[in-house]
C-alpha cells in the first residue's frame, strides 16, 4: 500500500533543518551556511522510502521578527507546519532547551497543530550521551511528543531510522510527485538560492540579509549547456563595492563557486552571468516576495 504526505521541519535558525532536508533528499536543494535565517521560503524536497513518498517542507527558522521580510518568513514557517501530516521540531543538542525552543513549544500547544509531532535532537556528536538523555526527558516533559529521535544530520547518524519512521506514519494514499522528482522548486529558483548561498558565505555581518538573487534568464543551448543570467538586488548603494570586492575579486569568486554548484546539481555545463542592481526598497516590493515563494501580505505588522 502506497503512502504519501507532508513533513514540516521547524526549529530555531541554524538548528540543522536544511542540512537534514538535503540529507533526506540526497541532493542540495536548500541553503546551508553558518549564518542564521538563510532559508527564506518554504522549500519542498521529496524522498522515497519503500512504498512511501515523503514530502519534506523546510521552513525558515522561527525567531522574533523585526522587518516585513522577517514576518513573512515566520508566517511561512508556521503555515508549513499547519499544512503537514507530521511536524519535526529540531533542537540543537549542545544548546538544549533554549528560550527560543520554549517559545516554539508553547506556540505548538497554542496553535494545536494537526498530525503527529516528533522531537528531533540534532548535532548529537557535540554532547555526552547522558546529557542527551537528560535533555530528551526535559523537553518531553514540556510537550507530549509522539516520538523522539537523536541524530546528526551532517554526519547522517540516525537519519535512516527517522526516515523509516516517517514512511510508516504517513497516511495511505497515492504518491503526489513523479518517483524521480526531488523538489517542487523551479530550477531557476534553486539556481538563485545557490548563488545567494555563495554570497552569504563570502560576505559578513548584516549584508547577506540585505540582498536577494533572482534568475532573470534561463536559456538551454543546443549543446545541452545552460546560460543563466542572475540579478543581485542590494538595499544600499554602499554595499555594491563590498559585493564586487577589490578588482571584482569577490563577485568573481561567488560566480565561480555558484557555477560549479549549479553544474553539479544540473549535470550539465553552465554559463553563469551575475549583475548587481541597487533597489533600496526591494524588501517592500510584492514581486520580490513572490520570487522567494513568500506571501507579501504575511509581512504586514
Task: Label each PLM-derived region with a short phrase.
Residues 1-75, 79-81:
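Conserved G1/Walker A P-loop phosphate-binding module
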Residues 16, 158, 250:
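Conserved glycine(s) of the Walker
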Residues 23, 27, 46-50, 65, ...:
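Conserved, well-folded catalytic cores of nucleic-acid-processing
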Residues 39, 63-64, 96-97, 127-128, ...:
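Catalytic P-loop NTPase motifs of RecA-like helicase/translocase cores
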Residues 48, 53, 75-148, 219-222:
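Conserved C-terminal guanine-recognition region of P-loop GTPase G domains, centered on the G4
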Residues 58, 122, 152:
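Active-site glycine-centered loops adjacent to acidic/histidine catalytic or metal-binding residues
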Residues 115-116, 125-183:
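Canonical P-loop GTPase G-domain recognition
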Residues 187-301:
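P-loop NTP-binding site
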